[in-house]
């Protein structure tokens, strides 16, 4: 059976949304937003804040294993931080070689590292040597910066450095998130390396998942924004829910939104809560027209309690008990 993973999504899939989405079900694992590593050893409180799953043995509340993702460009400091992070009960250490954000790339991190296969190899080898053998070290990459000319060289460098598996987002950095994802390139990479490759990019529906697997040749798939747009996508892929979204599911989505807002109360400042809910609704609009109506209704609201009252007034929005 194909495995399904919830992707790391910086600025989108924080701990609270990871908790809500994995609680919905269908995922074999999830990866945290990246933890940025510079020239210091990060203390436990950073991981407790960014990856609270470590306080529960490395699992989300639903029991989904969580992998900590690190982002940086210095092999020594990444290795030191990975060695410490490995003591905190994650189910693996993932290395970010795909972030397209300008602020990250400006400092030589994320996708910018795809210009230097030799450095990629040194980073993975250093981290692999520093982390106990029973903890997997994995990597997530894009196809390159402006083109895919070094894609196979980079993937080979990562695999030879000791990465247990590779997630390949089938776009370059400059491609951003614009469609289409080039799943055929994932197939080329998978044929060139001796480690498992997990396909990623543009999986919004069950049909997309089927096409992605067929074109890439990969059994396993990592889902990102498609999971945010349709929280039931993993269950649809597994055949546990209808293959296409329906109006009958909207009350379930409302309950998820209400639960999400409730959980945000305990995690972030109230002045930021409204923005997170609106951000999620902006993705849900792709799947449910009702989300567009709700987004329009709360668009100017900045008080999360006011948004909560709107949700409470909608049929089916009552949250499930904790």
Curated annotation (Swiss-Prot):
Q: Which PANTHER family match?
A: TRNA-DIHYDROURIDINE(47) SYNTHASE [NAD(P)(+)]-LIKE (PTHR45846:SF1)
Going by the UniProt record, its keywords in alphabetical order are: Flavoprotein, FMN, NADP, Oxidoreductase, RNA-binding, tRNA processing, tRNA-binding
The entry sums up its family as follows: Belongs to the Dus family. DusC subfamily.
Annotated TM spans: none
Superkingdom is Bacteria
What's the protein name?
Answer: tRNA-dihydrouridine(16) synthase
The cofactors named for this UniProt entry are: FMN
């Amino acid at each position: 059976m194909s495995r399904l993973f919830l992707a790391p999504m910086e600025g989108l899939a924080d701990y609270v949304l990871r908790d809500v989405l994995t609680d919905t079900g269908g995922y074999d694992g999830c990866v945290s937003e990246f933890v940025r590593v510079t020239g210091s050893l990060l203390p436990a409180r950073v991981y407790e804040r960014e990856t609270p799953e470590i306080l529960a043995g490395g699992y989300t509340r639903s029991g989904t294993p969580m992998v900590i993702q690190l982002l940086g460009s210095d092999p020594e400091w990444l290795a030191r931080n990975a060695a410490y992070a490995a003591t905190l009960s994650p189910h693996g250490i993932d290395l970010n070689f795909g972030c397209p954000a300008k602020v990250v790339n400006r400092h030589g991190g994320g996708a910018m590292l795809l210009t230097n296969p030799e450095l990629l190899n040194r980073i993975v080898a250093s981290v692999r040597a520093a982390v106990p053998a029973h903890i997997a070290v994995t990597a997530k990459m894009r196809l390159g910066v402006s083109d895919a000319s070094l894609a196979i060289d980079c993937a080979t460098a990562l695999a030879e450095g000791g990465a247990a598996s590779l997630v390949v987002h089938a776009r370059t950095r400059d491609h951003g998130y614009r469609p289409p994802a080039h799943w055929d390139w994932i197939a080329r990479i998978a044929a060139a390396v001796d480690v498992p490759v997990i396909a990623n990019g543009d999986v919004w529906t069950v049909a997309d998942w089927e096409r992605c697997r067929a074109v890439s040749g990969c059994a396993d798939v990592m889902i990102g924004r498609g999971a945010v747009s349709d929280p039931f996508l993993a269950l649809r892929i597994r055949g546990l829910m209808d293959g296409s979204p329906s109006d009958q599911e909207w009350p379930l989505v409302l309950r998820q939104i209400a639960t999400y807002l409730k959980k945000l109360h305990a995690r972030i400042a109230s002045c930021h809560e409204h923005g997170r809910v609106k951000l999620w609704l902006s993705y849900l609009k792709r799947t449910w027209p009702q989300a567009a109506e709700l987004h329009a209704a709360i668009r100017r609201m900045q008080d999360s309690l006011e948004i909560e009252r709107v949700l409470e007034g909608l049929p089916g929005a009552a949250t499930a008990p904790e």
